[in-house]
């Protein structure tokens, strides 16, 4: 066999292997970017040697074989995939090809949409009633998932409105919002079930359940983006108008569909969506650009596996492959031991990544990770990079097991893991330098006592020099002692002392949050402060009484009760009060008695806020008598929508729930 033939054979074999893992096993081994790279390489070689193209080459078809666990459905109109572009130059080349083929571009308009990262499906309606649903499969034959699709609430079982075709096959994407993905994995970790690497895998695994009752428990949703079969009816002559028609018939359509009349407008749309991507609430991996006119689409036609009139403009990969060089263990403020993978540095989503969290011992076991392994790293938005998969087929012979410590790597105290918890913890408490540092950093942080100018490096030095052991020791510092720290002159030292004095005047809620009670965030601290009013009342509260606070369950109540039952914690609180930490006398008012537009209401925040942090907004709302929930339901009274609000806003509008923007929230807060 000639070298070029050998190379082509190996590439095709590798691609088929990855297609099988992706489409059939729902367990991809490499990120999409690596698959795309291999496919581009194969196409390039085949274009140079067209005589060596085989009918079964991955470039000549859409995907892999369908699952055999479901009955098979042959698509009347093939479900083709799209060609990809990865940079502006490639998109402009696509635009030029379109213009050259059309000759006249006077009426050329692009319809731009989100490229959803889920599972492509076709749904057939006969006389407006859902009768069949199928996966894409290999583009020609898919799997019958009708029973499962019927459980997805976003998908109407019957269309409504006028002029519905006798047979209409719509196409779209089933996907899992980020909140639903986190909920599924949280439950899986609690029960010992399967933990999914990403929302796409979770959506695929949920949709391909043989038992529809399991699918029904998964919060899947759907956006419609196209049509296959059309009989006994008519549709508008443009893609964008068709989407509006689908929406009128009750099919969910993304609200981020935009018409662009120039290539420059398309690039602006791409950049805007990329900026909003972390706040959407669901995963996308690019934008889809389609010629809007159906007549022009027909004129442009198709190539072997994709239309000439559309392209997927993909974002920089959020997943990349690299090697694990070592695993180290960090100690948090509550003693949690967190394994961290030290990586061969790699660029992911535009950022150089050299570390990734491994969460806990269970996660290492689930991944089957060893030191030396080739792994897939994922970084989405501001999320800490994490290892999502191990490329087992490329494990080196000298790979070493990860050994979880039995003693704290900082203070050598015993490490214990409470039954039922995933996290192992150092038992050293404040004798552990790492816990002491992290507790003090939390205490002075902006959302706690907000000590201006006291950064992490100052805290590190204060602990290492043994100037500070408890939070109360901070208020005993003098400018003279602080000048003994690195890069701390007399003026800077006095500024820190002044900031500490200013920080003594705080609020009860901030003080509670600063104490660092396990599971007590800002909103919970605000709820506890509002409910009990005084420190004395909170210290004396039973677990049962604590659970009467909105959103405080048995876990938070137990941690709070145990914190105040610990004599050393009460001593630290007494010392803080003795040093002059104080807050205004409480005015305890029941929620129904609070004169506030938020009192007694269940409120949901969505999107990004520009004037307050999410936690600050929650705390303010709770203080005014609101209950802040994490998801929209029929019990929700009000949704506050910031920039790039996603699926929560859409659901609120669907349910007819009142929606206000950030400016209106600030006005109602009295700002």
From Swiss-Prot:
InterPro entries in alphabetical order: BRCT_dom (IPR001357), BRCT_dom_sf (IPR036420), DisA/LigA_HHH (IPR041663), DNA_ligase (IPR001679), DNA_ligase_AS (IPR018239), DNA_ligase_CS (IPR033136), DNAligase_adenylation (IPR013839), DNAligase_N (IPR013840)
Active-site residues from the entry: 115 (n6-amp-lysine intermediate)
Record-annotated BRCT domain positions: 593-671
SUPFAM superfamilies: BRCT domain (SSF52113), DNA ligase/mRNA capping enzyme, catalytic domain (SSF56091), Nucleic acid-binding proteins (SSF50249), RuvA domain 2-like (SSF47781)
Cofactor list: Mg(2+); Mn(2+)
Binding site for NAD(+): 32-36, 81-82, 113, 136, 173, 290, 314
Catalytic reaction equation(s): NAD(+) + (deoxyribonucleotide)n-3'-hydroxyl + 5'-phospho-(deoxyribonucleotide)m = (deoxyribonucleotide)n+m + AMP + beta-nicotinamide D-nucleotide
A Gene Ontology term for the protein's cellular component: cytosol
Keywords per UniProt: DNA damage, DNA repair, DNA replication, Ligase, Magnesium, Manganese, Metal-binding, NAD, Zinc
GO biological processes: DNA repair; DNA replication
Binding site residues for Zn(2+): 408, 411, 426, 432
Pfam families on file: BRCT, DNA_ligase_aden, DNA_ligase_OB, DNA_ligase_ZBD, HHH_2, HHH_5, Nlig-Ia
Protein EC: 6.5.1.2
GO MF annotation terms: DNA binding; DNA ligase (NAD+) activity; metal ion binding
Homology family: Belongs to the NAD-dependent DNA ligase family. LigA subfamily.
NCBIfam families: dnlj, PRK07956.1
Role: DNA ligase that catalyzes the formation of phosphodiester linkages between 5'-phosphoryl and 3'-hydroxyl groups in double-stranded DNA using NAD as a coenzyme and as the energy source for the reaction. It is essential for DNA replication and repair of damaged DNA.
Protein name: DNA ligase
Organism of origin: Klebsiella pneumoniae subsp. pneumoniae (strain ATCC 700721 / MGH 78578)
Gene: ligA
């Amino acid at each position: 066999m000639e070298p070029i033939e050998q190379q082509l054979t190996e590439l095709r074999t590798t691609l088929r292997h990855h297609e099988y893992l992706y489409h059939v096993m729902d367990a991809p081994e490499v990120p999409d970017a690596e698959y795309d790279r291999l496919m581009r390489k194969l196409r390039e070689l085949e274009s140079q040697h067209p005589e060596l193209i085989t009918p079964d080459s991955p470039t000549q078809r859409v995907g892999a074989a369908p699952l055999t666990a479901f009955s098979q459905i042959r698509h009347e109109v093939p479900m083709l995939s799209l060609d990809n572009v990865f940079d502006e130059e490639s998109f402009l080349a696509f635009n030029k090809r379109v213009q050259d083929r059309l000759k006249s571009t006077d009426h050329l308009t692009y319809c731009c949409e989100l490229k959803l990262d889920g599972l492509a499906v076709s749904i057939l309606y006969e006389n407006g009633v859902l009768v069949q649903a199928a996966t894409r499969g290999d583009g020609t034959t898919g799997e019958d998932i009708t029973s499962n699709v019927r459980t997805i609430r976003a998908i109407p079982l019957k269309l409504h409105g006028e002029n519905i075709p006798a047979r209409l096959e719509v196409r779209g994407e089933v996907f899992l919002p980020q909140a639903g993905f986190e909920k599924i994995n949280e439950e899986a970790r609690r029960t010992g079930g399967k933990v999914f690497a990403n929302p796409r895998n979770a959506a695929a695994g949920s949709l391909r359940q043989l038992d529809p009752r399991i699918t029904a428990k998964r919060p899947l949703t759907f956006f419609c983006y196209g049509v296959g079969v059309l009989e006994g009816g008519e549709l508008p002559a443009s893609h964008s108008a068709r989407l509006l028609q689908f929406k009128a018939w009750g099919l969910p359509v993304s609200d981020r569909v935009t018409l662009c009349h120039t290539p420059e407008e398309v690039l602006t749309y791409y950049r805007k969506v990329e900026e909003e991507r972390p706040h959407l609430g669901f995963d996308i991996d690019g934008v889809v650009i389609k010629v809007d006119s159906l007549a022009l689409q027909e004129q442009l036609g198709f190539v072997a596996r994709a239309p000439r009139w559309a392209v997927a403009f993909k974002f920089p990969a959020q997943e990349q492959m690299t090697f694990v060089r070592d695993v180290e263990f960090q100690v948090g403020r509550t003693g949690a031991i967190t394994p961290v993978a030290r990586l061969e540095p790699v660029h992911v989503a535009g950022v150089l990544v050299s570390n990734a969290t491994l969460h806990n011992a269970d996660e290492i076991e689930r991944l089957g990770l060893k030191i030396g392994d080739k792994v897939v790293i994922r970084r989405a938005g501001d999320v800490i990079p994490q290892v999502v998969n191990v490329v087992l087929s490329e494990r080196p012979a000298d790979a070493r097991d990860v050994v979880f410590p039995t003693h704290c790597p900082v203070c050598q105290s015993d490490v214990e893991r409470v039954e039922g918890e995933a996290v192992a913890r150092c038992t050293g408490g404040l004798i552990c330098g790492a816990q002491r540092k992290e507790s003090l950093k939390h205490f002075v942080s902006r959302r706690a006592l907000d000590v201006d100018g006291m950064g992490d490096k100052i805290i590190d030095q204060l602990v290492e020099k043994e100037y500070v052991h408890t939070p109360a020791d901070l208020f005993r510092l003098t400018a003279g002692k602080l000048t003994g720290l690195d890069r701390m002159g007399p003026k800077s030292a006095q500024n820190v002392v002044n900031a500490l004095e200013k920080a003594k005047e705080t609020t009860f809620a901030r003080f509670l949050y600063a104490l660092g009670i396990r599971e007590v965030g800002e909103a919970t601290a605000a709820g506890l402060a509002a409910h009990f009013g005084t420190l004395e009342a909170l210290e004396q509260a039973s677990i049962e009484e604590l659970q009467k606070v909105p959103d405080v369950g048995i876990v938070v109540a137990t941690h709070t009760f145990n914190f105040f039952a610990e004599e050393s914690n009460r001593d630290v609180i007494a010392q803080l009060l003795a040093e002059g930490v104080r807050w205004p006398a409480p005015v305890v008012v029941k929620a129904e008695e609070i004169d506030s537009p938020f009192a007694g209401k269940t409120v949901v925040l969505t999107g990004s806020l520009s004037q307050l942090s999410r936690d600050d907004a929650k705390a303010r709302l709770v203080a005014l008598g609101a209950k802040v929930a994490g998801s929209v339901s029929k019990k929700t009274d009000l949704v506050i929508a910031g920039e790039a609000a996603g699926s929560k806003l859409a659901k609120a509008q669907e349910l007819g729930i009142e929606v206000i923007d950030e400016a209106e929230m600030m006005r109602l807060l009295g700002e």
